[in-house]
From Swiss-Prot:
PANTHER family cross-referenced by the UniProt entry: STEROL REGULATORY ELEMENT-BINDING PROTEIN (PTHR12565), TRANSCRIPTION FACTOR BHLH137 (PTHR12565:SF431)
Protein name per the record: Transcription factor bHLH137
Keywords: DNA-binding, Nucleus, Transcription, Transcription regulation
Listed Pfam families: HLH
Localisation: Nucleus
Start-end of Polar residues biased regions: 63-84
Annotated organism of origin: Arabidopsis thaliana
Gene encoding the protein: BHLH137
Positions of the bHLH domain: 142-192
Length: 286
């Protein structure tokens, strides 16, 4: 086997020209032998050793190439593993971030949907008025709550009364503003008060004259009743009854005579002259 392997590895040997002569070469065996071209064949053991060594060399070369391939593979795997180790935390963090973002987006989407639903429900509840609720459209400064409706009614009543006062006072319709309107009403009431006081003073000054005139009328009415009862009754029905403002100074039971009436008339004229009243002053008002 060793020789066979040797011949396989080294097919061309020194015996090739002897065993396989070419047509171009004509070799003389005797001359060849004489020239001592023949060499001794190598020993079989040496051939086996050489072939075994060469086989071992081939094996070692093959194993070296395999080792190199394995080392390259391990290097590539090691580099890839190193890359994975080097980029592993960042990749893990990136995946964690993406997952967190997805979770946040899902939570936000859920919260947004829930918020929208709650808003829609609130709007629906606001749009649907309760059964016992009275919708009141209020202006600025007016109450709209149910507990303030009584206050609103009270303010409306006050405003109506202010309008009636404004209509009573002349020239107050043109005034704008509650303060100015109240000032106009106060001034008007004060003027009315002064006029009433002045008239009451005039009446107190001429009250005796008015009373005497009333007593004269009563005497005439009594005389007419005594003379003609029918005329007296008709006259009393036609004339209004006068009530004295102040207590009587004379006795009503006494019927005045003609002389007494004349004396009373003269006294009345003298009193009017002394007081300075006349018909124009009596009827004049401020």
């Amino acid at each position: 086997m060793a020789t066979f392997s040797y011949f396989q590895n080294y097919p061309h040997s020194l015996l090739d020209p002897l065993l396989f002569p070419t047509p171009h070469s004509s070799i003389n065996l005797t001359s060849f032998i004489d020239q001592n071209h023949l060499y001794p064949l190598p020993n079989i053991s040496t051939v086996e050793d050489i072939s075994f060594l060469e086989y071992n060399v081939d094996k070692t070369e093959n194993s070296g190439s395999e080792k190199l391939a394995n080392t390259t593979k391990t290097a590539t795997t090691g580099s890839s593993s190193c890359d994975q180790l080097s980029h592993g935390p960042s990749a893990i963090t990136n995946t964690g971030k993406t997952r967190g973002r997805k979770a946040r987006n899902s939570n936000n989407s859920k919260e947004g949907v829930e918020g929208r639903k709650s808003k829609k429900q609130k709007r629906g509840s606001k749009e649907e008025p309760p059964t016992d609720y009275i919708h009141v459209r209020a202006r600025r400064g007016q109450a709209t709550d149910s507990h303030s409706l009584a206050e609103r009614v009270r303010r409306e009543k006050i405003s109506e009364r202010m309008r009636t006062l404004q209509n009573l006072v002349p020239g107050c319709d043109k005034v704008t503003g509650k303060a100015l309107m109240l000032d106009e009403i106060i001034n008007y009431v004060q003027t009315l008060q002064t006029q009433v006081e002045f008239l009451s003073m005039k009446l107190t000054s001429i009250s005796p004259v008015v009373y005497d005139f009333g007593s004269d009328l009563d005497g005439l009415i009594l005389q007419s009743e005594m003379g003609s009862p029918e005329v007296g009754t008709s006259f009393t029905n036609a004339m209004p009854t006068t009530t004295p403002i102040f207590p009587s100074l004379l006795d009503n039971s006494v019927v005045p005579t003609h002389a007494q009436v004349q004396e009373e008339g003269e006294e009345r004229e003298n009193f009017v002259d002394r007081s300075g009243f006349n018909n124009n002053n009596f009827c004049s008002f401020p």
